[in-house]
Amino acid sequence: MSNAITMGIFWHLIGAASAACFYAPFKKVKKWSWETMWSVGGIVSWIILPWAISALLLPNFWAYYSSFSLSTLLPVFLFGAMWGIGNINYGLTMRYLGMSMGIGIAIGITLIVGTLMTPIINGNFDVLINTEGGRMTLLGVLVALIGVGIVTRAGQLKERKMGIKAEEFNLKKGLVLAVMCGIFSAGMSFAMNAAKPMHEAAAALGVDPLYVALPSYVVIMGGGAIINLGFCFIRLAKVKDLSLKADFSLAKPLIIHNVLLSVLGGLMWYLQFFFYAWGHARIPAQYDYISWMLHMSFYVLCGGIVGLVLKEWNNAGRRPVTVLSLGCVVIIVAANIVGIGMAN
């Protein structure tokens, strides 16, 4: 396995670790509605940081974006909006199925759809079937899916042992939302594929290869921001129990506390895709679809490890932890299989 591929896998791991940890600061926000908290963090992660970093990277910010036709920018934006819809559905999936089943189904579907649809759309799927390296990467995707399933099973055992239930369990509604979440969340993978002309243009301007994907986030995350912020603002305006004014009428120290934590959560959320871009840059072009598989499977891996570190599994008993550990090992094996496949 080449150093470039190894570093690509490593950066995807770092990005996934940030994704697994980003919600921790949000959990410490006090007396704010979820909508206010999510909006503050989202403005940082989806608008301020993408724009600021792109302004630093590009020699002429406005000239870069104005050089693209609407036919280039619109698919990137719409796939970003598609991802935004998946993001909203994620929370609803957890409500109706519970954390473990919801995450397992949603992540499993988005891993398959986001990974395999890209080469199908690009007409390259036959290369995966007819080459040794392609078959190895497909095997890695299958093994990763098995790993996600094992971790999901561990979560179910933990919830059963600790008496944790879904907020409003509804299997039919939950499954529909989980499938929608999985499909729509893959929009980020499709957006990165559609944004290749933007990456190439950034490279032509002399932007370092590690950073060429970052300017496209202005458009991708702009699409996601409209969906997420629109959802939050509509609820803040229409739901009687929610009030943006009330949330910002608290004691000044508490407002500062909440803003800083929300900003930190937004920063950590953005960093997952900052390092995703680094990892994506190191993956061979013919296997760039694997970036999504690495990100999603490592997200599950890191989520399990973070749960152990935070002692969330302390009262779950030995069996759930053993199953979780097995799932994590399987995901690590999957990453190595994919790495070997890409090297071939």
From Swiss-Prot:
Q: Where in the cell is it found?
A: Cell inner membrane
Where is it mainly found?
membrane
Q: List the catalysed reactions.
A: L-rhamnopyranose(in) + H(+)(in) = L-rhamnopyranose(out) + H(+)(out)
Query: In the UniProt record, which is one GO cellular component term?
Result: plasma membrane
Q: How does it sit in the membrane?
A: Multi-pass membrane protein
| GO MF annotations in UniProt | rhamnose transmembrane transporter activity; symporter activity
Do you know which Pfam families this protein is assigned to?
Answer: RhaT
Query: Transferase: is it a keyword of this entry?
Result: no
Transmembrane regions listed in the UniProt entry: 4-24, 38-58, 68-88, 101-121, 137-157, 175-195, 214-234, 259-279, 290-310, 323-343
Keyword annotations of the record: Cell inner membrane, Cell membrane, Membrane, Sugar transport, Symport, Transmembrane, Transmembrane helix, Transport
Recorded family membership = Belongs to the L-rhamnose transporter (TC 2.A.7.6) family.
Role this protein plays? Uptake of L-rhamnose across the cytoplasmic membrane with the concomitant transport of protons into the cell (symport system).
The protein in question is named L-rhamnose-proton symporter
Taxonomic lineage is: Bacteria, Pseudomonadati, Pseudomonadota, Gammaproteobacteria, Enterobacterales
Q: Please name the gene that encodes this protein.
A: rhaT
